[in-house]
Amino acid sequence: MSKIFMFDALRAATDEEMAKDPTVCVIGEDVGHYGGSYKVTKDLHSKYGDLRVLDTPIAENSFTGMAIGAAITGLRPIVEGMNMSFLLLAFNQISNNAGMLRYTSGGNFTLPLVIRGPGGVGRQLGAEHSQRLEAYFQAIPGLKIVACSTPYNAKGLLKSAIRDNNPVVFFEHVLLYNLQEEIPQEEYFLPLNKVEFVRKGKDITILTYSRMRHHVIQALPALLKEGYDPEVIDLISLKPLDIDSISISVKKTHKVLIVEECMKTAGIGAELIAQINEYLFDELDAPVVRLSSQDIPTPYNGSLEQATVIQPSQIVDSVKSIITSVKAIIT
């Protein structure tokens, strides 16, 4: 076991796959000589050369389209968005090409493409660089969507994403790159379509992902001190949602709290609520509750930025409120 930062875990995953497979390449702004905006591709340029770690102009639509073409002609490109918000400029390529080509070609084309990079709220990057685009991409047919949350799952998930023959959008939170964790030195892979049970419990199911996983963990001491026993699930796969694993938990706890950084309107939580109500309505003792970011552009001011995101104290209050309301009905 070795303790490494999350950005190093992502770099190690990329390095290992590039060493094993000469078709794996990295494309994006400053991924080469500079080593990536958060150093995920540091030193890969000197090891693999200009053609496999390709610096591009500031033209997301162009290099994303180039990567899609490379994927259908035999390469396994990894596109790094310097900030995931920039990929709005490549939305046409991602939606009309990456998401659809395997279907519209009748299966004649595979599209082994990873689109990854930093996103989420933090570091006072302002409204345009702090968007939560998970739900935007969730609506595109043909994409798989993953959100890593620890060095361990970041490495295992990225290696699996690189080897997948379908396009994978891989979200990394800007505030988690310096998170440290011990990970195995031997090679490992993690499934792209499964949740992670962070904590087993019996009172309530808390569904979360990315940075909010850590806010939920921060809320646990206060909840445990007062005798609450929550089950915590990191979704990891945002598309497809692992409704089978979620069902196991809901059938045990009968109560659900969703904690997300995505905005409330048409967010990941909204789709979760729809599927839980569709498949598990009879298992619920109370309506599903979601804690989401406010439906406003992210402020630049640090205090205001923080106020738009769900905090551990809000999670504690919501868990207590849900469980208390159910007990009141029962008694």
From Swiss-Prot:
SMART domains the UniProt entry points to: Transket_pyr
Binding site for thiamine diphosphate: E60
Name of the top EC class for this enzyme: oxidoreductase
Catalytic reactions on record: N(6)-[(R)-lipoyl]-L-lysyl-[protein] + pyruvate + H(+) = N(6)-[(R)-S(8)-acetyldihydrolipoyl]-L-lysyl-[protein] + CO2
Gene Ontology CC: chloroplast
Residues making up the signal peptide according to the UniProt record: none
Amino acids binding K(+): L113, A161, I162, D164, N166
InterPro entries, alphabetized: THDP-binding, Transketo_C/PFOR_II, Transketolase-like_Pyr-bd, Transketolase_C
Recorded superkingdom: Eukaryota
One MF annotation (Gene Ontology) recorded for this entry: pyruvate dehydrogenase (acetyl-transferring) activity
Keyword check for Metal-binding: yes
Location(s) in or outside the cell: Plastid, Chloroplast
Pfam family for this entry, one: Transketolase_C
Known partners and oligomeric status: Heterodimer of an alpha and a beta chain.
UniProt function note: The pyruvate dehydrogenase complex catalyzes the overall conversion of pyruvate to acetyl-CoA and CO(2). It contains multiple copies of three enzymatic components: pyruvate dehydrogenase (E1), dihydrolipoamide acetyltransferase (E2) and lipoamide dehydrogenase (E3).
PANTHER family found in the cross-reference section: PYRUVATE DEHYDROGENASE E1 COMPONENT BETA SUBUNIT, PYRUVATE DEHYDROGENASE E1 COMPONENT SUBUNIT BETA
Protein name: Pyruvate dehydrogenase E1 component subunit beta
